[in-house]
Amino acid sequence: MLEEAGMPPGVVNFCPGSGATFGNAIVEHPKTRLIAFTGSKKVGLDIHARAARTREGQIWIKRTILEMGGKDSTIVSTDCDLDAAVEGVVAAAFGFNGQKCSACSRAIVEDAVYDVFLERVRERVQALRVGDPAENASMGPVVNRSAMQTILSYIEIGKGEGRLLTLSLIHI
């Protein structure tokens, strides 16, 4: 798309790959000018520290853009469009199976609309179709077994902290 807009080939490259191999090579290479990373705080801080070190043949300071494990919230007030709030929260929380830096991880809801909002979110989530995303399902698998185990551990933490869990886990 960038090339179609007139950008010369190779100026911007999207290069997904294993962080332990491809990612480390990019961070360490003396000709890398900018590193954009989305992931854990631990890995992001490591990338930042390594990018700050100069290497033989490096002629500029590397820049970093680091999006690291945040807690994205949505505020639902009594005067909001409740239908839009429900759709927005469900899309933000469950889009890409929650595997994105902007996944909504909490909703702060005014008492006056709390029960109605919760019920509508519950209904909307229960209507999500689980399956192969290539077949128009709302939710598919997470990226790997490690991600699944992390999600399951978060659920257990939430239960242990007395957090409200309103839906059953679907484990295929």
Model-derived features: positions:
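Phosphate/diphosphate-binding loops
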Residues: F37
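Accessible peptide chain termini
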Residues: M1, L169-I172
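PLP-dependent aminotransferase-like
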Residues: M1-G23, W60
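ALDH superfamily catalytic-core signature
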Residues: E28-H29, L34, K42-I170
